[in-house]
Amino acid sequence: MTNRPIYQKGAKKPAKQSPGKEPAYLAALHLMPCCICQAFGETQLSPTQAHHTIHGRYSTRKTPDRAAIPMCEGHHQGLMDTSKTALHQQPDAWKAAYGLDTDYIAGTQEIIGNLTF
């Protein structure tokens, strides 16, 4: 006989929230302007997306939501707005032009920290 917990038929185990997941933080981040457009005086032409930083990361794991920064689609994926250098399309050119994506975390956290939910 095993010592497993007994669940009623059809009952689901309670869902666990993954560590590092903060939906309220990401919701606030989506309301912000692109940090790259803001820093470099560019016009934001596409919606803001949450970019989970990749520079300085040494695994395939996504960084926690608190390490995400607001980027327009053009600076992030570059699939719809091709007028900008997109991090996921041209990572070396993006890094040369704008620096490390991790450099924008502190400013993002400061702005979101001043918001009230």
Which positions does each model-derived feature cover?
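A boundary/linker detector
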Residues: 1-47, 88, 93-101, 105-117
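Histidine-centered nuclease catalytic patch
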Residues: 35-69, 82-85
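Zinc-coordinating Cys/His ligand positions in small cysteine/histidine-rich zinc-finger domains
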Residues: 72-75
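Di-metal (Zn2+ and/or Mg2+/Mn2+) metal-binding site signature of metallo-dependent hydrolases
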Residues: 79
